[in-house]
Structure formats: structure tokens, C-alpha cells
Amino acid sequence: MKLNTLMKSYYSSYDYNQLRDETKSQYKYHIGIMLDTCLEDKPIGNLDCANVTSRMAKEAYDIWCDRGVSLANHVLSASRIAINYGLHMELCLVNPFLSVKRRGTTPRKTIWTREQVQTFLDTAYNDFHSRNIGLIAQMAYEWCQRLGDMRVLKWEDIDFDMKRVHIKQSKRRAEVFLPI
């Protein structure tokens, strides 16, 4: 079975279709990069699953790393997941991407000091047009939640009697109740 055919099977699977739309889109993008990567003058997608070796998977990973280590790690993860589906469905015998070691990435996080947070909030609250941004940022900071989750809060999410806010976290889909 060709890798292209295996991926079509994965895209029609229950496993894939139960993912969030954003995750499906990201997987399709990253798997597309994997399938289009040329090794030995052929796209990997045109190769038979049984003919893709660990060496080839490592060579493909090195090619992806030339575009960025973070991208390469995402492509590797999506490829592993999709080919593992093939293993479970007995469509292929091995997953050559499992033996590829990921390269580390430098964290993209910038940690603000309390003074920087205070300066940001002071600036936001001093201007009428940016006060809403300040409020969203302060709630995210105080409750350790994602900015996007704060942005979609509604008044009905606040229970003033119980003095708590109800938040549905977008990443984990968890529902949390935080004191206000």
C-alpha cells in the first residue's frame, strides 16, 4: 500500500474525524509536507509503506529541519500518528518514523516581570479604546488562563452569587470554575 493511500484511509477514519477542525487542518498540512518530501527523486507519498525505512524517515526529518525544527517536529508527530493508525488497522507493518529522534527547540516564551505587567495594564486602562484588552489580559494573568478563553467569556459565565467564573478551556476542553 502506498503512503498516499494509507493517508486517505486515515483521513476517512473515525480517529481522524473525531479531532477538532483546527487539529484536522494542522494534521492535513503537516502530513502533506511529509507526503510531498522527495527522497531518491520520489515523493514519499508515492512509496510503498513497506519500502519506507527508518533511514529514509531520518533523511526526511533532516530535510524538514532545514525549514525549521518546530515545523519538523510537528510533521514528525503527525506522521507518527497517521502511520500508527495504519499499524493498528494492519495496513502496514512498521512505523519508520518512531525511531527518529526529535531535535530540541528553544522555548518561544517570554516571561514578563510584575513591573512589565503593571506597566502594560496601566497603559491599557489609561486609554478608553484599549481598556477591554487590558481587562482580558488581566483576567488571563490573574487566573492563569489563555487569552483566547478570556476573550470569549460572556456575562452568563459569571456567577455573582457563588463568586466564581465558569470557563471552558479551548485546548483541553475542560470546564473550570474559578473564584472571582
How would you label these PLM feature ranges?
Residues 98-99, 162-168:
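Short functional hotspots where side chains directly engage DNA or cofactors
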Residues 152-158:
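A short, basic/aromatic helix-end/turn motif that makes direct DNA contacts
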Residues 22, 106, 170-180:
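C-terminal catalytic core of Y-nucleophile DNA break-rejoin enzymes
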Residues 8-22, 32-108, 122-124:
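N-terminal core-binding DNA-recognition domain of tyrosine recombinases/integrases
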Residues 80, 151-152:
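Short, surface-exposed helix/turn micro-motifs that flank interaction/cofactor sites
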Residues 31-32, 136:
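Generic structural marker for isolated residues within well-ordered, non-membrane alpha-helices
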Residues 69, 73-75, 88, 92, ...:
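Basic, Lys/Arg- and aromatic-enriched nucleic-acid-binding interface segment
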Residues 3, 20-23, 27, 71, ...:
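Hydrophobic (often cysteine-bearing) scaffold residues that line and stabilize catalytic clefts
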